[in-house]
Amino acid sequence: TYGGFVIKDKDGNEYNSNKATISGLAAHTTYYYKVDDKEIKSFKTGNTGKFRFAFVGDPQIGSSNELKGSDTEAFYNAQSNAVANDSYNWSQTLKKIQSAGTDFIVSAGDQIQTTKKKAPGNSSTTSEIEYAGYLSPDTLASLPVATTVGNHDADNANYQYHFNVPNLSNLGDNGKVGGDYYFTYGDVLFMMLNTQDTNSAEH
């Protein structure tokens, strides 16, 4: 299945969010795919009988920017430089993770740095460059990541435009980024809780 929609920033620039879901894949098999006119990529499905995953926390692309959010050229330049530096380090980390034979990654949250509250004008798209940096490493074309909502992700619907999660529930939904979700890998159940919704009874 496939679905897409558009959001706009304060200048009227449009951003597309496209999500695709495929089913019926065989285990331990290489598949090839292509997005628009980009180069062909591949991924290999895992062996669910025995697998390895990496647990990471706070990639927080853009966090090396020491300037507070302001609608100034200085802030945007500092943000751009921070994203470049943080994305490089994130990419190097992912290469090491993949070289260890990892099947997928579980992220504890805070994929990016700039919250909507601290963005210039409370813009929901200021973090777009940070998400672009987070998703830029070539490794992520073939290495799946299961993300969790962190406090830097939670106040901005922009988070949910970048990740396609399975079995999404309205339980734990804080009204912006969706609720809890789960998936199984082999005989293991992974339950991903949106802990930014503090109603513990819902989870």
Task: Describe the function of each predicted region.
Residues Y2-V6, G12, F55-S91, T115-T125, ...:
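Acidic/histidine-rich helix-loop elements
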Residues D58, G109-D110, G150-N151:
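Active-site glycine-centered loops adjacent to acidic/histidine catalytic or metal-binding residues
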Residues I61, I112-Q113, D153, L189:
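Short active-site segment of divalent metal-dependent hydrolases/proteases
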Residues T102-S107, Q111-T114:
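Phosphate-binding active sites in nucleotide-utilizing proteins
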Residues G12-T21, T30-S42, A74-A78, A119-H203:
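Extended active-site neighborhood of metal-dependent phosphoesterases/phosphodiesterases
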Residues T1-N77, Q98-S99:
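Acidic, histidine-bearing metal-coordination/catalytic regions of metal-dependent phosphoesterases
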Residues N89-K96, G133:
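Well-ordered alpha-helical segments embedded in enzymatic catalytic cores
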